[in-house]
Amino acid sequence: VNKLFPKKHQLYPEDYDMVYEKQYRPSQTRIIDAAAVQTDHDIFKSFQKKECYGMPKPPRNITTLPSTTKVEYSRYMYALANYVKEAEHIEWYAFSRTPRQVAERITDILANAEWAVPSDFSKFDGTISDIVRELERMILRRAFHPSCVAEVLDLHSNQFNKTGLTRFYVKYLSGTSRASGSPETSIFNTIVNAFIAYATWRLSKVDGEYVEPDVAWSKLGVYGGDDGLTPDIDSDMYEKTAKMFGLQLTTETIMRGDLGIVFLSRFYTSDVWFGDPNSCCDLRRQLGKFHTTVKLQGVVPVEKLLEKSRAFYLTDRNSPILGQLVSKAIELNGGAPAMSKHHNLVRFGSDIPVENQFPNEYREDYHAVLDKQLPNIDYELFDTWLASCNNLYSLLSPPLIVEPEVAVTKHETVVDGDVARPIVTSTKLETVAENETNNPTNRPSRVHDARAFVAGRVAIASAHHVRGGVHGGRGTVGDGNVTIPTERQPDQRLGLRRRHRRGRGRGGNGNS
């Protein structure tokens, strides 16, 4: 806290004009206008965000705060964020930089590093603990003038331990978790992110001595939201420190010269260690959802295609597959389209000039990234199809260049009207064997025979695992995960069981 604010009590809340300037989307301006005439209630309202995922997983819960609380708290959070962005001694804050400057910061911190640790917090908002909340209170007390402290602490306390209400009127308690729609989300998540790295260094020993505060501060990398990149930090100690604060951190150690540096979903080349700032997006993730969007009134498919193409043309025109696709769209349109009437709904960063975007000059490593993510892409089929496209509408019907994978889930999940069932891992084979032993229709004579029986079924499943497909009612074998084959049931396809349409799914409130 002292490193963040060498001089205490320097900040005051921003004026209301700043809030109006920053929160210009229609949904945001409605909240601001409501704050002038409404009295706050003490309940959080939430809804599920409409977005694509790479696998079946719980949807993200978006929480909307009472209007007056949000507007007043925004004044303080903008003041805090502006300070962190502008302070010369804070070099690790990613959101104070343009995308190009973020890439340059990465090359700077890797220049003399022996290794680096990309990091990502899981369920960051949902795992904020009491001790993290106390850290935030300490920051607010030191940052703001004494005349403001009581108000900002009161506003801060109104961000958690509240009753929540979903769109379908299911009540829940928020606990100390962070409300996703709170003004504090971006700034505090980033500060907490950097703090965990700082605390890790302070808990580390060099030559038998704990790292001093000044040294720990100087060793910080770059952080933005739940993403981080820290040079030369011990990844085991890093995860252990996060756990001490109730947080879930995933790390990976990348040695100098190796491919694998990732930050803010940008994949950097192996030459980033030697000053090359070029990168590509997470191609698997972006290709998997490029063709999707929420239903927007008055927006037709070709228009959305051009808007997405315009955005990715700025950041990934030289990335394989995706860059080729968006470049073709721009070519067939006769050039990049201007910002449309729906400019406030387009991809984040679309308004940043190309000279300030992430550098994306062509590099062979982009193909290495893509081939690792999607090893069986049919490049020839894609190139042939793309060359045959002579208008924008033809781009809306691409061929299948990668076989789809079977949905892998920890819980029964509805996927396109089917129920995807949990994968049975090899560690559960003994349990499955015991279940088979107790099955009167399929009972081997001994437990040993049951294990052999299950192992045989796994072998059959493995033999029928072709290109990620599922055949004959048998499940998937890959990455150590298996589904025990079963006899095909009526209307059973791809290892998925069709649920009767009139019945409820397993989603909350009867929604699947």
Show where each model-derived region lies:
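Viral RNA-dependent RNA polymerase
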Residues: 1-511
